[in-house]
Amino acid sequence: MAFTIRELSTRTFSDFEKIAAKQGGCWCMYYQREKPIRLKSSDPDWKKMNRKDKRASVEKGKSHAILVYDNETPVGWCQYGAREELPRIDAGRGYRKVGPPAGAEKLWRITCFFVDRDYRGKGVAKLALTAALESIKRQGGGIVEAYPVVSKKMAAVAEWRWFGTPGMFKKEGFTKVAPLGTSGVLMRKTISPN
């Protein structure tokens, strides 16, 4: 199976919509907001607001993701972005104990993966991660953070692996920095610019 990749943009937003609708309605907006919105995830307005806000972020160039395709069908994505694009991480209790690295000029974050059920276990997330890291390098590099799940209970459920796994990040050269509560771990890697 030969996959291709594309960056999330106004041109690829309709492809993102196709796969985001399958994912459940978050639209990868949780970490793009500094504070939670006051709607429950079961509320139809929550999904509409997330879609609208994601589109606006993409149009402003404030939302980054790698889309993975099987021919012309979008089958997965990896969201990444600069710290200012994904501010919610800073509010996490575990993250606040560690904080961002001192003196980091450019801090990037990898927050979400989604792979269509029919394509899981076929290397889609790995391809998306590699492409995201290459994109970060082209954009000047810097320190990249990841927050994979380490809880065996949570990792056993596909829907809870949206952060990725420690193993996939370790293979890309990330090192463990600190635990994030009992369910996650902070990992970092420095990428030199092109």
Summary of predicted features, one role per range:
Residues 1-38, 194:
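Conserved N-terminal entry element of GNAT/NAT acetyltransferase domains
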Residues 110-115, 121-138:
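Conserved acetyl-CoA-binding loop-helix of GNAT-fold acetyltransferases
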Residues 63, 182-187:
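Short hydrophobic/aromatic beta-strand or adjacent loop that forms the aromatic wall/cage
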Residues 138-142, 150-178:
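Conserved active-site alpha-helix within GNAT-family acetyltransferase domains
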Residues 56, 60, 74-112, 120, ...:
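Conserved acyl-donor/pantetheine-binding loop and adjacent beta-alpha core of acyl/acetyltransferases
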Residues 110, 144-146:
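Conserved hydrophobic beta-strand within the GNAT/NAT acetyltransferase core sheet
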Residues 30-64:
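Active-site rim helix/loop that mediates acceptor-substrate recognition in acyltransferases
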Residues 16, 63-78:
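Conserved beta-hairpin
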